[in-house]
Amino acid sequence: MLPDLTDIGTDPASTRVVVAMSGGVDSSVVAGLLARAGFDVVGVTLQLYDQGEAARRKGACCAGQDIYDARDVADRLGIPHYVLDYESRFREEVIERFADSYAAGFTPIPCVDCNRTVKFRDLLATAEDLGASVLATGHYVASRALPDGRRGLFRAAEENRDQSYFLYATTQAQATKLRFPLGGMRKSDVRALAAELGLPVADKPDSQDICFVPGGDYAEVVERLRPEAGEAGDIVHLDGRVLGRHRGVMHYTIGQRKGLGISTPEPLYVVAIDAARREVRVGPREALAVRSIGLTDINWLGDVPLLDACAAEQDIYVKVRSTRPPTPARLLRDADGAPTVELLAGEEGVAPGQACVFYDAASGAARLLGGGTIVRAERAGRHLAAAQVA
């Protein structure tokens, strides 16, 4: 099913749309559909890091070859195309924060920071400078008008392609100016459209790696920027026993079982990371069960103010990992009055640095309500993991 483009503009010829073109099939199809519909389309591709290394790698988005692919698609569509050098912004806003988070014992999601900053905040400003009405991307998430006139974000039609988890930090103001034409489409249909449009990227593989991590080896990036994250320390059981030594906190995440380098009669899992003491704490699987989550940097897209929703103990759904299904939860206020999330069915392996993303219960978990960065996880009143975001 082709997307409805009327919410972008009813007079295409007089409506300028900037398309964020990564060089992949999804954003290329967005540009192609809009150009075919008669919109005034401008393609923009971001150069985010050293292209000399990236151009030799496969499976990473925004790599050197991707810039050439985006330009090739734009040429075939007959639309203007610009490459913007955002390397310094990307390093400061995404790569440095990524390294800081691992050094602090967190498990960060750099794609969230990238979407929140350079891809939306900065690129929306560029789109405005270019006189565009909206910015369109190839993300798999839906955008629809709400009854009160605001725009809501919704999970994509194809569940295993849904990217709403990574877009939770999109603000209400940004949502007004963003459009996601592929939210109601299946990937197979997108590729078929790419072939129909004659795009050279119709069969191009999807990106897999974190774009700035060569060969998927994030530890090399972290240790180069934050050497302290690679310093060895103790692996400590919850009962206080020192079981061995670890290779640096950056190599571990909550819920990890393999690669601990210790031999014990029973399976043990990473249940907490204390970067200040250089300790990796392990325990049995039941120690991973979490019932309450504390958050920072919360972005709220609900219909009432966040603290009002917490005071009313609003039922929601949440995702604490991108690959997990939404699970029932409740918004509350902790003893200090700060928003907190109660997991009604519990969750395992809740890692500080990951996102807890909110979905509307009334819509069957279809509508995105925002989310925040996990900084605290508690099990039955027992504190398991806490940290301050660097």
Curated annotation (Swiss-Prot):
Known EC number: 2.8.1.13
Higher taxonomy: Bacteria, Pseudomonadati, Pseudomonadota, Alphaproteobacteria, Hyphomicrobiales
Annotated function: Catalyzes the 2-thiolation of uridine at the wobble position (U34) of tRNA, leading to the formation of s(2)U34.
UniProt protein name: tRNA-specific 2-thiouridylase MnmA
Membrane-crossing segments per the record: none
Subcellular location: Cytoplasm
GO cellular component, as recorded: cytoplasm
Family assignment from sequence similarity: Belongs to the MnmA/TRMU family.
Taxonomic source organism: Azorhizobium caulinodans (strain ATCC 43989 / DSM 5975 / JCM 20966 / LMG 6465 / NBRC 14845 / NCIMB 13405 / ORS 571)
